[in-house]
Amino acid sequence: QRQMCIRDRHSPPRPLLQITVLKILVACHRPYRLPHKEPYLPIEVGAQKRADLHLGGVRDSEGVNISQKNPNYCELTALYWARHNLPETATAVGLTHYRRYFGIKKTSDPLKDIFSLSDWTEFLKESPVILPPKRNYFIETVESQYVHAHHRQDIETLRAVLSEKHSEYLPAFEKLMSGKKTHILNMFVMRRDLFNQYCDWLFDVLFEVEKRLDISSYSVNDARVFGFLSERLLDVWLNTNNISYIEKPVVLTEKINWIKKGSSFILRKLGIKR
């Protein structure tokens, strides 16, 4: 089945984006205070469903896009948009989220704590890829955590696709699945050539998984499956291709209820709550 990519005919034409050496997309889906300074570019995800809502920046329904897949692909619709619509003059591309950014907490205002263009310029001299710190699951593996939180068939289908179409990535995948740490959040900054390669590989894998996986009975949260799976693929791609990276801290615009989050984690592991 051919994958659908659409071009939004209803959006007004935009002037060519003013591109610096770096563009970091800020994925958002509702009105929120956003950074409107270089190198940050707010992008409204799932915009095809909200023709009357414009949040500033760009929309993932413009140009070549998969905006209609946002309920299942989450912020990856922004990633796809960037791969196919950002001019190649953007020599590095990143992805963040309206509630989380790379930065160091120094003030009471998170948007003042995010890294500046000059910070990123220095980071990219040090490494072609910048990531957040790894998540450590401590009491279970990356695979068991996913299975307790979502559906086993997601991982099994992904494993089958890698085995059949990208077998060179299977050793790194199995090593990651049996380990307890991985980079999640779908946050990174990459040199453009690596960004293009990663996106092409990632969507080739996920589109094939989508063809094979029946999610018709999934809850709204579990239906975000391809966004969740992508978080378990970034390290697989990096490790297989021996690509170096550095890690930088994350600042949040909203507080996390760690007690609730931790309780849910334990209950899922015990099979009491999905």
Briefly describe each language-model feature range.
Residues Q1-I6:
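Short, small-residue-biased leader/transition segments that mark boundaries at the very start
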Residues L17-R274:
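ER/Golgi luminal nucleotide-sugar-dependent glycosyltransferases, focusing on the catalytic module
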